Amino acid sequence: MKFSTLKTVLIGFIFLPALFSCSTVPKDIPEELTAQELIQKGQSEFENGRYVASLAYYNAVTERYAEYPALYLEASYEIGHLYMKQKKYDKAKVVFQEILDIYANSQPGTLPGSYNKLSQVEMQKLQDKN
């Protein structure tokens, strides 16, 4: 086998996975999916390392269910967690601060407390990095 042919084959093996991973990003997210289905798909994509697709599903929740605070907070927290995993700390900080602001401006007991506490923990991690 000639060197140039071997080189072409090796390059193909290197870039082929990247090509297929890009094809998993949803172009259109079905409108009939519930918030829980969207979150589940986002988590599945995250676990498989497909962060762009994961973000698309979580963003769909924040856009479609913005009037449902518990769903909005859950998806927002997942977005912040995703940014932390990618080491996009500036973006994560914005998301977690928004979550904390929502809690600060709401009546106590009206929202699930878990995302407030989780966001506080993540913000502390961000401060420790500085």
Regions found by a protein language model. Name each.
Residues 18-21:
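C-terminal motif of bacterial Sec signal peptides marking the signal peptidase cleavage site
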Residues 23-25:
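Bacterial signal peptide processing site
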Residues 33, 70-71, 108-118:
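Structural signature of alpha-solenoid helical repeat junctions
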